[in-house]
Amino acid sequence: MIVSDIEANALLESVTKFHCGVIYDYSTAEYVSYRPSDFGAYLDALEAEVARGGLIVFHNGHKYDVPALTKLAKLQLNREFHLPRENCIDTLVLSRLIHSNLKDTDMGLLRSGKLPGKRFGSHALEAWGYRLGEMKGEYKDDFKRMLEEQGEEYVDGMEWWNFNEEMMDYNVQDVVVTKALLEKLLSDKHYFPPEIDFTDVGYTTFWSESLEAVDIEHRAAWLLAKQERNGFPFDTKAIEELYVELAARRSELLRKLTETFGSWYQPKGGTEMFCHPRTGKPLPKYPRIKTPKVGGIFKKPKNKAQREGREPCELDTREYVAGAPYTPVEHVVFNPSSRDHIQKKLQEAGWVPTKYTDKGAPVVDDEVLEGVRVDDPEKQAAIDLIKEYLMIQKRIGQSAEGDKAWLRYVAEDGKIHGSVNPNGAVTGRATHAFPNLAQIPGVRSPYGEQCRAAFGAEHHLDGITGKPWVQAGIDASGLELRCLAHFMARFDNGEYAHEILNGDIHTKNQIAAELPTRDNAKTFIYGFLYGAGDEKIGQIVGAGKERGKELKKKFLENTPAIAALRESIQQTLVESSQWVAGEQQVKWKRRWIKGLDGRKVHVRSPHAALNTLLQSAGALICKLWIIKTEEMLVEKGLKHGWDGDFAYMAWVHDEIQVGCRTEEIAQVVIETAQEAMRWVGDHWNFRCLLDTEGKMGPNWAICH
């Protein structure tokens, strides 16, 4: 086994120059440094480790070092260089798996000052350097300090333009930290049997003897790095046209909103607490006031006649009277960009907030306001106006104006290369960023069809035929309920699973929760499974918190297997529990449940345990599913990539969107995805049959 790291002049999409590399070899216990002129020798050393059946360890290697070396070898040496996946270990992947609850464990380090605030909860190598006590400074910070001392101006990214010996020193230190991190990770007995020295085994032993989760996360990271490099073909022109349409509607709404809500006066500038006129008790709920020290009704007498009252004193033209408190105010014109203004006008129209920020302010967005209804038609029209404005503003932010807007992320190849963290959530679910492709509006939401249609295989033309590619969209059928049925099966002998596959599960749930409609039941069960609170559940039937609590209670009473499952989870996790001053005090047996692939899935609170179990099961099923689908497609002779037959473009929770060279290939992808899902169910002895649904078409609007 060898541990390595490279430094180059840019991120993957624009990298052109290898600066240096370092290798630590466990067989010799030596560090070897490679400078720019040693690039060929460095590649030779890596290939020699592969030839021995050994392992190469990088931090973030799957996403950067490995593809960067392939690119640079061709660019600088005209050499074909490809490291096989099975020979590569990524400590970033292992860190995210083994320390998925890093934010919980980092609090002590943060308080002690061992970990800087900017590194809190981070899996970056620099953060691990601080945690492990191996940090010798950060190259960028030291480079900027050196420039300051020399009186030179820093330009963003210039520390990577050219090789220097300080860079070489930091490169060595990065490998020191990666080695220390690797050894910490390998010491976790849950994932790596302690009787095996994993630094002294070949790749076959490493993958077969470590926990299954280790292999799954590495395969997923490798595949999703490939997906990110593929990118999602994007119709820039269509979204630019949509932006023009949205901006015009926004202008119209701004005018209407200003006309509707006009202006008002509000307190501003008071410095003293208002006190009760009789008792003198401060009244903090009232606006702050000011008490003038000068001023009156009349000015002071100027002459004898005025003093004797024979002649009136002049009127005091000053605005205030000494000792008479007043509330300073300002004139405010309604500003639709102000959340304070919006929530004020909404509450005046009869809206009652149900969700608040950490600072106590009402949360105001289009989702929160979705179900808001008041009796007064005029006030309802005002609320609807605000709702539409917020929705339009959100679409504009997503598509064009926001920091992470789609138009800002279209690469030169006409594709959006969204980033995926395959294990970003504590449950094992992936998270998405730059931009977040998991938040593209659905086709049923306003402007959703135009948004989804912009993401499509049709926007990629084949390099040989010039024809547009075809899109295959496949999603897991009813995954959440099937996961629930799997875990319930030991308590109901598979009755719930049978109802899902052969009956009408939503009608069954409707009866169990005593809900008025089947649609209510669908909304209820998914809210229930995703941990919705009593208030949210109550809103399903247009009621509040108490009704929501009652619905949950009835559902559990009438579905005893779910109650038994919840109780079983509680018994596994909780030693004892009591409520003190509205807070649950828990004595834990352990704070994790076992995932399908053996991993520890950390639980934040007892009431979230069932939701965590189900979300983790769904995430791991889909993760293994996308891995197996690609594997089966390659086994059938298809090549992954835009220069081949199919290309993964997006994986979002329980669906994959795949670009295909022809309709025939798209059909093969849809059929293979179903085969792969069935394989996953068999592999983990799932107690409810797993299925997929596939659609073929030109873009995401059709294939979702």
UniProtKB/Swiss-Prot annotation:
Single GO term (MF): metal ion binding
UniProt-annotated stretches for the region Polymerase: 202-704
Region called 3'-5'exonuclease, residue ranges: 1-187
Residues reported to bind Mg(2+) 1: D5
Effect of H123S: 83% loss of exonuclease activity
Cofactor(s) needed for function: Mg(2+)
Reactions accelerated catalytically: DNA(n) + a 2'-deoxyribonucleoside 5'-triphosphate = DNA(n+1) + diphosphate
Annotated residues for binding of substrate: H506, R518, K522, Y526
Domain of life according to the entry: Viruses
Cross-referenced PROSITE patterns: DNA_POLYMERASE_A
EC number, as in UniProt: 2.7.7.7, 3.1.11.-
Annotated function: Replicates viral genomic DNA. This polymerase possesses two enzymatic activities: DNA synthesis (polymerase) and an exonucleolytic activity that degrades single-stranded DNA in the 3'-5' direction. Non-processive DNA polymerase that achieves processivity by binding to host thioredoxin (TrxA). This interaction increases the rate of dNTP incorporation to yield a processivity of approximately 800 nucleotides (nt) per binding event. Interacts with DNA helicase gp4 to coordinate nucleotide polymerization with unwinding of the DNA.
Family: Belongs to the DNA polymerase type-A family.
Protein name (database record): DNA-directed DNA polymerase
